[in-house]
Amino acid sequence: MFDIGVNLTSTQFASDRQKVVKRARDAGVTGMLITGTNALESQHAQRLAEAQPGFCWSTAGVHPHHASEWSTEIASTLRRLAEKPEVVAIGECGLDFNRNLSAHEQQEYAFDAQLALAAELNMPVFLHCREAHARFAAVLEPWLPKLAGAVIHCFTGTRDELEACLAMGLSVGITGWVCDERRGLELRELLPLIPADRLLLETDAPYLLPRDMRPRPTSRRNEPCFLPHIVNQVATWRGESAEELATRIDQNARTLFRLA
């Protein structure tokens, strides 16, 4: 089973990153994608992935929260990072109109620039969309024929938004949000709509600790070693075998990010 979204650069992991990776391996995780959210963290993510060859890979990008930082220098940094074998996708990029930590215009500019970079480099994109679906689709759609693949990470949208993402050919990343007894109920009902070959799972660790884990972890910090819990729950709600789902999400990740 492959975890496509781990924020291993987070300071929450500063004291025990190696142990976190070991616990993930011991839990049966077969690969992890470390998320880059700005230039510095993308460089850090690449170094962390380089230290775990064959198990960790990384993305290089600028999250919409950091879109105001976008510059030609940052674009050049991402381009250089993309030459590294561990860097397998551009992102995390997209739009976030919930927190609005960067102006909408800055977000759209940085998003479009990263889609252009991914198209130029023939790399898949790791996408973020929160409360911005209409503009997200408007910026993304013209680039789709030129992209080598795309996954919308941490999908928490509506049925209409899911159907639109699937119509655009996107893969869909599901996190432990779906395990939330209150917030995750609508998303839970949408799981059977996602084609088997376009479903990916992720922890988004250290965030989004699954709320239905029993016994509850002593720490509120999420870890990639909890991915098996998400796999088991999603398999139950989709009405399929957890073992088959674990194998399939690994295959899907390796196909999208061209790791096979």
Curated annotation (Swiss-Prot):
Subcellular location(s): the record lists: Cytoplasm
Molecular function via GO: 3'-5'-RNA exonuclease activity; magnesium ion binding; single-stranded DNA 3'-5' DNA exonuclease activity
Its annotated function is as follows: 3'-5' exonuclease that prefers single-stranded DNA and RNA. May play a role in the H(2)O(2)-induced DNA damage repair.
Instruction: Show the PROSITE patterns listed in the entry.
Output: TATD_3
Protein name as annotated? 3'-5' ssDNA/RNA exonuclease TatD
What family is it from?
A: Belongs to the metallo-dependent hydrolases superfamily. TatD-type hydrolase family. TatD subfamily.
The record's section on InterPro entries has: DNase_TatD-rel_CS (IPR018228), Exonuc_TatD (IPR024918), Metal_Hydrolase (IPR032466), TatD-like (IPR001130), TatD-type_Hydrolase (IPR050891)
Enzyme Commission number(s) from the entry: 3.1.11.-, 3.1.13.-
Name a Pfam family for this protein. TatD_DNase
Q: Which residues bind a divalent metal cation?
A: 92, 128, 153
SUPFAM superfamilies given for it?
Metallo-dependent hydrolases
Record keywords: Cytoplasm, Exonuclease, Hydrolase, Magnesium, Metal-binding, Nuclease
PANTHER family assigned? DEOXYRIBONUCLEASE TATDN1, TATD FAMILY DEOXYRIBONUCLEASE
Q: Primary place of residence?
A: cytoplasm
Q: Which HAMAP family match?
A: TatD_exonuclease
Cofactor(s) listed in the protein's UniProt record: Mg(2+)
Domain of life of the source: Bacteria
Q: How does it assemble?
A: Monomer.
Q: A cellular component term (GO) from this record?
A: cytoplasm
